[in-house]
Amino acid sequence: MSKFKFNLYCNDTLEPSSSDKNTPKYVEWDYHGGGDVNLYVSQRALDAINDTSGKPTYIWLLESRQIIPQFYDWVLTNYDFVMSRIDGIFSCDESVCEKYEGISYGITNAAPWVVDRQIYKKTKLVSMIASNKRMCEGHAKRLQFVDKFRDKLDFYGRVFNEISCK
């Protein structure tokens, strides 16, 4: 099966995908302009308004509004101008998608990165993989959950019990 080729303009390579080790079945990222559609991701989103390639051009706000608020704010404040320059926007923020016709919902892929997927023996009812990130409110809530249930759950991650292939 042939893959659909996107020109990817992103600060990350997204290799093999936007979810680390989960290789896309239908998409191939092209970093040299050989694809059929241009996709400007998160921190490169504003570069899309200067695209003169003539190819369909989209912005993908892959990160949440809490992580890249300045890009969401600029795009939404200048929505009519941005939409006059591109073909559409993808976002994982449902409230933004409901409010703006040109913004489509695109779920952020958070598939597990576990290489050897199986059901492992547990010492407690629930296990959780968590990081110590504190970049937004959701991160803080996760860490509050960790503190509250520290003795009732098995925690894994860089800070707790590091695993090499999460």
Model-predicted segments: where are they?
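Nucleotide-sugar donor-binding catalytic core of glycosyltransferases
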Residues: 1-166
